[in-house]
Amino acid sequence: MQTRPRFAVQSLFAILATAAALVAGCSSSSETSDAPLPDGAALLQESASKTKTQQSVHLLLTVQGKVDGLPVEKLDGDLTNAPAVAAEGTADLIAFGQKIADAKFVIADGNLYAALTPGDPLSNYGAAANIYDVSAILNPDTGLANVLANFSDATADGRESINGTEAVRVKGNVSADAVNKIAPALKADGPVPGTAWITEDDHTLLQAQLEPTPGNSVTMTLSDWGKQVNVTKPAA
């Protein structure tokens, strides 16, 4: 196996790791109602409890600015932990000084398959967990639910429409431990500013965002929670 393609695949999954890390920019959002806001800390805990029970999601991740260890512009894909860990999607990333657009990836039967050049067949890069354990994203102890449960100084500071659904915007700081469990590539050594967009009525997490350094952030838009994800294992 060639080193350069494998490095690019590792970069892609460092991205997916941080995707687990969180949310905002390229979805449609706008300020909405000026109704009284709920308690931000309570809303985060309610959303954390709901997110713990989820086993599948569609995610759209974008990076604003430059985040060290994360050479990605966008990742768009589906992920499930049941009945087995599986994922598929595409990513735009920078590797070897060049942009790789719409790189396809599939995780099936524990292995990572990827095609870094459009039109190429998917190649088997071996055990996906050796690059990034995607099950961590939906794991209640290491993933999105754990991030929501580890906000400090949480404050609900407004409402926004996220892709047509009204959400309460909650800002605060996420513990370094929670950040590093879901996104080791960020190598946080202190609390990281974070924002979560959560529906008030059923506590669904619609977006999340981490800002490791001022002006540089990772944003993930989440949808289709609980929808069945069917991933076909590529032919050998």
Swiss-Prot record:
Notes concerning its domains: Forms a U-shaped beta-half-barrel with a small hydrophobic cavity able to hold a triacylated lipid or triacylglyceride. A flexible lid region may move to accommodate different TAG molecules.
Protein name: Lipoarabinomannan carrier protein LprG
Primary gene name: lprG
Chief place of localization: membrane
Annotated signal sequence range: 1-25
PROSITE patterns named in the record: PROKAR_LIPOPROTEIN
Record note on quaternary structure: Interacts with itself, Ag85A (MSMEG_6398), LppI (MSMEG_3851) and LppK (MSMEG_3904) in vivo.
Keyword Lipoprotein: yes
Gene Ontology CC annotation, any one: extracellular region
Keyword Cell division found: no
Keywords: Antibiotic resistance, Cell inner membrane, Cell membrane, Cell wall, Lipid transport, Lipid-binding, Lipoprotein, Membrane, Palmitate, Secreted, Signal, Transport
A single GO BP: lipid transport
Lipid-carrying residues in chain (N-palmitoyl cysteine): C26
InterPro entries in UniProt: LolA/LolB/LppX, LppX/LprAFG
Family: Belongs to the LppX/LprAFG lipoprotein family.
